[in-house]
């Protein structure tokens, strides 16, 4: 059997590391990049010094400040991060022709047919990490395996500034031993549900018939059952034009408190706004999705007169969208935010200028 050779590269605390590189006084300090801790700001990235206090991305910035009062809070500089990301992706292009960017700081590379380093994906990953360090002054972690699932798990294993390899003969046993929460697509609510069923490690999924798993997991059952055996057929896909950008989350406890709903929406808004920035796009339409405790799902959308380009633009539209729902009177278990009508930022800015 011919195995694929997949490398997953993930920069270490990318935004925060760029800030520490550019300002030596920040090195060794707990740095938090994101929104203001004075309001509803959300953490976009945290240095490893800040992570030692339990601070992670998507957490409320106000909570992060309480956790670490001495933390240094910085606004994101997306233009700077994009420029460095382009430099890093240029390095990737020297090793692979099939590259799937996931974000500014993360990508999959399919090096199956490459003859670099006599076809050794491990040596290629070492060379990529070395060049990133030499050319940008930043560190990256890499995972090498025969599919995307295992390459991603491996790069997490190697963090920070490391390399981890999962060969084909070790793949099934390696993934089976992982906590169920490490699987892509298993969020906190799904993990809690599975753990109540006694499924705490990925391998525990194999004790269940696929039909029984389908009752609890729906269409995800087959994918997760394959994952438990180290199987992932997803190809590495070069970037294609996007039609929408979205994020949603199911929560372990339902709520009808509007203040809490706004708090739970904040990291989702930050996530989609960050993706919008990464792809240098603006949106014409914002859609809010709710699922009530009885599993009824609804969406509400708005298309403002001007372009939606950042988190503040989305936040300004949320109260009116929520007012069109029964949030506050009916308990909510899932929230989602999506952006559509995507256009390149410069093109939209030129059009908007011409109209005004």
UniProtKB/Swiss-Prot annotation:
Domain UmuC: 6-187
Coiled-coil stretches noted in the UniProt entry, renumbered to this chain: none
CDD domains per record: PolY_Pol_IV_kappa (cd03586)
Gene3D superfamilies reported for this sequence: 3.30.70.270, 3.40.1170.60, 5' to 3' exonuclease, C-terminal subdomain, DNA polymerase, Y-family, little finger domain
Residues that, per the record, bind Mg(2+): 10, 105
Cofactor binding note of this UniProt entry: Binds 2 magnesium ions per subunit.
GO MF annotations, alphabetized: damaged DNA binding; DNA-directed DNA polymerase activity; magnesium ion binding
Subunit text: Monomer.
Function: Poorly processive, error-prone DNA polymerase involved in untargeted mutagenesis. Copies undamaged DNA at stalled replication forks, which arise in vivo from mismatched or misaligned primer ends. These misaligned primers can be extended by PolIV. Exhibits no 3'-5' exonuclease (proofreading) activity. May be involved in translesional synthesis, in conjunction with the beta clamp from PolIII.
Protein name per UniProt: DNA polymerase IV
Organism annotation: Halorhodospira halophila (strain DSM 244 / SL1) (Ectothiorhodospira halophila (strain DSM 244 / SL1))
Biological classification of the source: Bacteria, Pseudomonadati, Pseudomonadota, Gammaproteobacteria, Chromatiales
Gene: dinB
């Amino acid at each position: 059997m011919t195995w694929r050779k997949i490398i997953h590269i993930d920069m270490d605390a990318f935004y925060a590391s760029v800030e520490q590189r550019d300002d030596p006084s920040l090195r060794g300090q707990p740095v938090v990049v994101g929104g203001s801790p004075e309001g509803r700001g959300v953490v976009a990235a945290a240095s490893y010094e800040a992570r030692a206090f339990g601070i992670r991305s998507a957490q409320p910035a106000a909570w992060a400040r309480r956790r670490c009062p001495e933390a240094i809070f910085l606004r994101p500089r997306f233009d700077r991060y994009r420029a460095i990301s382009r430099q890093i992706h240029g390095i990737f292009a020297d090793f692979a022709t099939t590259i799937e960017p996931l974000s500014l700081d993360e990508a999959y590379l399919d090096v199956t047919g490459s003859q670099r380093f006599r076809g050794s994906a491990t040596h290629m990953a070492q060379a990529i990490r070395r060049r990133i360090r030499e050319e940008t002054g930043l560190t990256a972690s890499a995972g090498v395996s025969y599919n995307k699932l295992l390459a991603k798990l491996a790069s997490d294993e190697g963090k920070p500034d490391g390399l981890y390899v999962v060969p084909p003969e070790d793949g099934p046993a390696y993934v089976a031993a992982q906590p169920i929460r490490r699987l892509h697509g298993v969020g906190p609510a799904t993990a809690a549900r599975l753990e109540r069923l006694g499924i705490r490690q990925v391998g525990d999924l194999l004790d269940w018939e696929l039909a029984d798993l389908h009752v609890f997991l729906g269409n995800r059952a087959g994918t997760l059952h394959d994952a438990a055996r180290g199987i992932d057929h997803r190809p590495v896909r070069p970037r294609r034009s996007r039609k929408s950008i979205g994020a949603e989350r199911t929560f372990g406890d339902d709520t009808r408190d509007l203040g809490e709903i706004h708090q739970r929406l904040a990291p989702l808004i930050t996530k989609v706004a960050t993706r919008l920035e990464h792809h240098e796009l603006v949106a014409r339409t914002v859609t809010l999705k709710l699922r009530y405790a009885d599993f009824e799902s609804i969406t509400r959308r708005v298309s403002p007169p001007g372009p939606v380009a950042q988190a503040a633009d989305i936040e300004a539209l949320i109260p009116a969208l929520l007012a069109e729902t029964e949030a506050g009177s009916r308990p909510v278990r899932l929230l989602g935010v999506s952006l559509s009508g995507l256009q390149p930022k410069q093109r939209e800015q030129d059009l908007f200028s011409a109209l005004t």
